[in-house]
Design a protein with these regions (language model features):
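Universal eukaryotic N-terminal targeting presequences
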Residues: 1-2, 55
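Alpha/beta-hydrolase superfamily serine-hydrolase fold, recognizing
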Residues: 9-25, 30-82, 105, 109, ...
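An N-terminal hydrophobic leader/cap segment in hydrolases
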Residues: 78-142
C-alpha cells in the first residue's frame, strides 16, 4: 500500500518531492527503485490504469484539501440572528471573493470606475436568464419624459386598483437596473393589482448628481400630466417607492414636489433609504465593524465609494478612508448646534446604544480639502433629505429599516424628523433583515416586507 502511494506521489509531484520528503520514509536504495519504476514497472494496461487512477484520486484529494483550506481561511461567520443565514453565507462568500477581493485588484489596475463596471457585471449575472412574466402581467419598455422606464401592467383579471406605484431602484446611484427587481415587482403586483412604473434613471459615474433626481422628477410629472391615460391609472392616486439610493431619490422627490406646491405623490415608501452622508460612525455603522466586519454586505467603504462616484469626486482609497473616519466634515461643522442636534445618537432606540454595539466618538479633525467640497453638497436637501428645514406638508410615509444595515440609523432619524414636523409616518423595523433583502429570492423576511407594503398601500392609496 505504501509503495502504491509513493509511486502515485512520484507521478504527481516528480523527483523534487521524492528527494525532499521521502528520505524520512525510505533508504536511498529503495528510493532508486521508485525513480526508475515509472519507466519499467507499468508495462501493462492494467498497471497504467491503476497508476493513472491513483494519480487522479490524489489530485482530487489535494484540490479538495486546498479548497477546504481556502474556505476555512476566508470564512467570515455571519451573525446568528440574521435572516436567510445559510443562503446568505454562500452568496456573501461568492460576492466577497469576486466583488471585494477581485474588486480590489481591478481598482488597483483600472481605478474606481473600472471597479464599478466589475460590480455592475457581477450583479447582472443572476439576471442573464430571466423567467417570463406571469400571464397576468405585461411588461413594457417605455420612454417617459426622455427617461427609460419599465412598466408592469396587470391584466383585467388581476387589476384590483386604479392607483399606480412608481418604483425607484437602489444600487448606490451607480449599479442595478429595474429588471433586477422583477421578482419583487411581480410579487407585489400579485398583492395589490395596480400598475407599476420602474424608473431606469442614468447611473453614475457616467452622469453625476443631480441628474438622477431630475430624471425621476420628470417621469413622475409626466405620469401625472399625461401618461396616466396610456397606462390606465388615476393620476390622483400615485405612490412612489424606492430602496436604498432609490429611497433617497424618493424622499428627495417628495420634498421637491412639495416645494413646488405640487400634490402629485399621495404616499412615499422608503425601504432602507440613504438619508444623509454626514455620519459614518453611527451605531449602525459601528455594528457592522463589530458583528460582520469584512463581509460583502453593504459596508462603509462601498457606501463612501458610491457617494464619491455619484457626486463626481475622486473615489481614491485615501478619500474612502477619510470618509469612513468622518473626516469629510470639519470639526466645526460636526459640532455646530444644527448638525449635532440632527445627528444626535440619543434619538435612536436605546437598544441600539448598548456598549457591546456602540461607543460614542469625538468628532475628528476634518480633512480641509475634502471637507470643503463635501460640506457644500451635504447641506443640499436634494442629496441629504434629513437637512431639510421644513417637512410639513409632505405626503404620508412608510419607512422600512433593517437590523443588519449600516443605513439603519439614518432611516430612523428621518422617521423622527418627519413625525416631528407632523407628517404621518409608519415605521416598520425588521431586526433580522439585511440591506438588500428585497433582492433575496425565496425569503420569508422579504415576503413579510412585501406583505406589509401591500397592506399599507391598500389601506392608504
Amino acid at each position: 500500500m505504501l509503495s502504491s502511494f509513493l509511486i502515485t506521489q512520484r507521478l504527481v509531484y516528480g523527483d523534487l518531492l521524492l528527494d525532499a520528503i521521502f528520505p524520512f520514509f525510505l533508504p536511498a536504495a529503495e528510493r532508486k527503485h521508485f525513480r526508475v519504476g515509472l519507466n519499467t514497472d507499468a508495462q501493462s494496461f492494467g498497471e497504467w490504469f491503476l497508476l493513472v487512477t491513483g494519480m487522479s484520486v490524489a489530485v482530487f484529494l489535494i484540490l479538495c484539501a486546498f479548497v477546504l483550506a481556502l474556505v476555512s481561511v476566508l470564512h467570515i461567520p455571519l451573525p446568528d440572528g440574521i435572516c436567510d443565514r445559510l443562503k446568505l453565507q454562500l452568496l456573501e462568500f461568492l460576492l466577497r471573493i469576486s466583488n471585494e477581493y477581485l474588486g480590489d485588484l481591478v481598482e488597483l489596475l483600472f481605478g474606481p470606475v473600472g471597479r464599478n463596471y466589475l460590480t455592475r457585471f457581477l450583479v447582472a449575472l443572476p439576471y442573464i436568464f430571466q423567467s417570463r412574466p406571469p400571464k397576468w402581467c405585461t411588461v413594457r419598455q417605455e420612454t417617459i419624459a426622455g427617461v427609460r422606464c419599465r412598466v408592469y401592467l396587470p391584466s383585467k383579471e388581476m387589476k384590483k386598483s386604479t392607483a399606480a406605484l412608481v418604483f425607484v431602484h437602489g444600487g448606490g446611484w451607480c449599479i442595478m437596473r429595474p429588471n433586477y427587481y422583477d421578482g419583487a415587482m411581480y410579487s407585489l403586483m400579485a398583492r395589490i393589482g395596480m400598475t407599476i412604473i420602474s424608473i431606469d434613471y442614468q447611473l453614475s459615474p457616467e452622469v453625476q448628481y443631480p441628474v438622477a433626481v431630475e430624471e425621476c422628477e420628470a417621469v413622475v410629472k409626466a405620469l401625472h400630466a399625461e401618461k396616466h391615460a396610456e397606462f390606465g391609472f388615476d393620476p390622483e392616486r400615485i405612490a412612489v417607492m424606492g430602496d436604498s439610493a432609490g429611497g433617497n431619490l424618493t424622499a428627495v422627490l417628495a420634498q421637491r414636489l412639495r416645494a413646488e406646491n405640487l400634490n402629485i405623490i399621495k404616499r412615499q415608501i422608503l425601504i432602507y433609504p440613504v438619508i444623509h452622508g454626514f455620519d459614518f460612525q453611527s451605531p449602525s455603522y459601528q455594528s457592522y465593524y463589530r458583528h460582520y466586519n469584512g463581509t460583502s454586505l453593504l459596508n462603509p467603504y462601498s457606501m463612501a465609494r458610491f457617494y464619491l462616484l455619484y457626486l463626481g469626486l475622486p473615489a481614491t482609497r485615501e478619500n474612502l478612508r477619510k470618509i469612513t473616519e468622518n473626516r469629510h466634515l470639519s470639526r466645526a461643522m460636526r459640532n455646530s448646534p444644527a448638525v449635532a442636534e440632527m445627528l444626535n445618537h440619543n434619538q435612536l432606540p436605546q437598544e441600539f446604544l448598548q456598549k457591546e454595539d456602540y461607543e460614542p466618538k469625538e468628532a475628528p479633525e476634518g480633512d480641509k480639502e475634502l471637507s470643503e467640497r463635501f460640506e457644500k453638497l451635504l447641506e443640499d436637501s436634494n442629496l441629504s433629505p434629513l437637512v431639510a428645514k421644513e417637512l410639513a406638508g409632505l405626503p404620508p410615509a412608510m419607512v422600512l429599516t433593517c437590523g443588519f444595515d449600516v443605513l439603519r440609523d439614518e432611516g430612523i432619524l428621518y422617521v423622527r424628523k418627519l413625525r416631528k414636523h407632523g407628517v404621518a409616518t409608519k415605521w416598520s423595523h425588521y431586526p433580522a433583515a439585511f440591506h438588500g433583502v428585497l433582492n433575496m429570492p425565496v425569503s420569508s423576511q422579504r415576503k413579510q416586507m412585501l406583505d406589509d407594503i401591500a397592506a399599507y398601500l391598500r389601506q392608504n392609496l
